[in-house]
Amino acid sequence: HEEAGEALTQKAQQLVAHAKAHKSKIIVPAFALGRTQDLVMRIKRLVAEGRIDPLPIYIDSPLASKVTDVFRKHPECYDEETFRTFTSEGDPFAARYIRYVSSPEESKRLNEMKGPCVIIASSGMCEGGRVVHHLKHGIQDEANIIAIVGFQAEHTLGRRLVEGWDVVPIFGIPTPRRAQVVVFNGLSAHADRNDLLAYVRAISPAPQQVFVVHGEEKQALSLGAAIQTEHPGMAVVVPAKDSIYEI
């Protein structure tokens, strides 16, 4: 379910208070493109409004750093609110408490560092990247928090964390999970079921054929059935893996 903005803020406040009280780490698996930049801007806004105290934040993703540089170079692509922030307050992705980590050596030092701090690293589903190393070193500390801020596909480490597994495979080694897992719903950048149904309704002229892709099988089949029910004359296809269609 989606969480309202105030509920998300209260949850963030609780996490920051916990990290400060326990001198612990908040580990955030995040996609390098879009999600990391969105999180940085959300955190900056909450700090500026006095809603949360600033903690040291480490963006530990070389790709996220490069993508952020692209964002910085093209303010003409921002929405109105972000553009106002950029022109009035300067770089929307920088603050005295935010550091972008580049070298592997600096990334490794984060594992030896005491909290409180926030580590935002990719990959978003914990299937690779530097976040897996941070999980390896931090997941067995019950004072630490793993904050899930995006969709986690089936059979990924991220999904297992969301499902509350007590032991998870990290680099192929069964590893006890003692850190708390906190899920933030409502941050998805994808359209939901109702949005997708509305999108199909709005297409004019109506398509003769619709392919439901980029989703888990159960949900894709359910969405396909819903589209078919609304549009009986439409050919709705949920492609099987490795199938080929000529359009």
Language model regions located:
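Acidic/His-rich, metal-assisted hydrolase cores and their charged scaffolds
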Residues: H1-I247
